[in-house]
A protein has these predicted regions:
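Active-site phosphate/ATP/adenylate-binding loop shared across adenylate-forming ligases
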Residues: 1-28, 34-50, 54-315
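Short amphipathic beta-strand/extended segments with alternating polar/hydrophobic composition
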Residues: 316-320
Length: 378
């Protein structure tokens, strides 16, 4: 049980800087920018873009272009050859890949700092929930591992062949915090089933998860929202029981798709019971925001990442957006300067935001129509 003062102190430290950043987002983002450009100045890319002379956000925008994955691919190729300083401020730890849900899978380098931020920010949704609910049994039980495999392809890096896989599985396998908050089954067991992601492959994974978890003290599930739902449907169909009949879960921590609260939550609750659905806005590139309370919005990690938004009236800081204002998100991480993540985001006021979806014509049109007919509700 995580009830000792020492445990509480550790948990509070995980969310403390996040909470503090929400009191003064402008100051938090100023500090984050300073740390980021200091790191970028150590790279060839950063030096080429005058990182050592950046004095503020206007300088940053003037010298660093907003870029997408395609523009950065030549720099990743240099890292692959062994020249990590071409783009990274510190040595490469591993490579990770996206799910490719919107096209070809992207393969990205990961450093120690990047992984540390993924682990720390990724834990905030759980820790914040436990602290605010006073429910530490959530952290004492098992969390269902419904992640993608971490061993999928091979890549030659600096003359050596390495294996890499999907980011969710890789992060789960490397996360030291999971020594205490345990995934069930272990990521190595998931990987042993192979790298496929067909329906049959997922059925084999779901069956492994079910066999390992049945009878165990499972307190939550965490991962890609459609996968969490597909797992529930699988065991209901094959074993005749819903998750709520097998486990007393405290919450579901859901990522990676839009409309989690409005489209998925009602269906998930039919299978898992009337429990909180906690949204996390995460991607291979970072864990950018998470739900802080019962309102159906996410709150940014201003202390770890820099957030800008390209709106119809120009590029603004995310925290500067007025309620109802929206646009294309640009993130800066410890690895990626001014990266066009490809998502649309909308402000709901008071550090609350809603991820609209991918930056695609149909989604933009849908949102324009939504605001036209229901904008008065925002």
């Amino acid at each position: 049980m995580f009830t000792g003062e020492e445990s509480l102190s550790i948990f509070r430290s995980i969310v403390a800087s996040w909470y503090e950043s929400l009191k003064d987002p402008h100051n938090a983002q100023t500090q984050t920018l300073a740390k980021l450009v200091e790191a970028y100045a150590k790279t060839d890319y950063g030096q080429r873009h005058n990182a050592h002379n950046i004095c503020g956000i206007e300088d940053f925008r003037a010298n660093f272009p907003a870029v997408g994955y395609a523009e950065l691919s030549p720099y990743f190729a240099e890292v692959q050859k062994g020249n990590y300083k071409a783009f990274l401020p510190e040595p490469l730890v591993c490579w990770v890949m996206t799910r490719g849900s919107t096209g070809h899978a992207k393969v990205l380098p990961a450093t120690k700092t990047h992984l540390e931020q993924i682990f720390a920010c990724g834990a905030r949704a759980l820790i914040n929930f436990a602290l605010k609910k006073g429910d530490f049994e959530l952290l004492s039980g098992k969390i269902l591992n419904l992640n993608f495999p971490s061993r999928v392809h091979t890549l030659v890096v600096d003359g050596k062949e390495i294996t890499y896989g999907y980011s969710s599985g890789t992060y789960a396998k490397l996360n030291p915090m999971l020594d205490k908050v345990s995934l069930l089954p272990r990521q190595e067991e998931i990987d042993a089933l192979g790298s496929g992601i067909t329906r049959k492959d997922w059925e084999r994974r779901f069956e492994l998860v079910y066999q390992k978890a049945v009878g165990a003290d499972v307190t939550a599930a965490m991962g890609v929202t459609p996968v969490i739902l597909a797992f529930a449907r699988h065991i209901a169909k094959k074993h005749g029981k819903k998750p709520k009949e097998l486990w007393k879960m405290r919450a579901l921590f859901c990522t990676s798709v839009r409309k989690i609260q409005f489209k998925y939550a009602p269906v998930l609750k039919r299978y898992y019971g009337d429990i909180p659905i906690v949204e996390i806005y995460s991607a291979t590139e970072g864990v950018f925001a998470q739900q802080i309370d019962s309102l159906p919005y996410v709150t940014p990690n201003y202390d770890a990442y820099l957030f800008e938004v390209e709106t119809k009236s120009g590029v603004k800081m995310l925290h500067e957006l007025k309620r109802g204002e929206w646009g294309k998100l640009i993130v800066s991480t410890c690895i990626l300067p001014r990266y066009k993540i490809g998502d649309l985001i909308e402000a709901a006021g008071k550090n609350y935001f809603r991820v609209i979806g991918r930056d695609k014509p149909l989604i933009r049109l849908e949102h324009v129509l939504y605001r036209l007919f229901l904008g008065w509700l925002i």
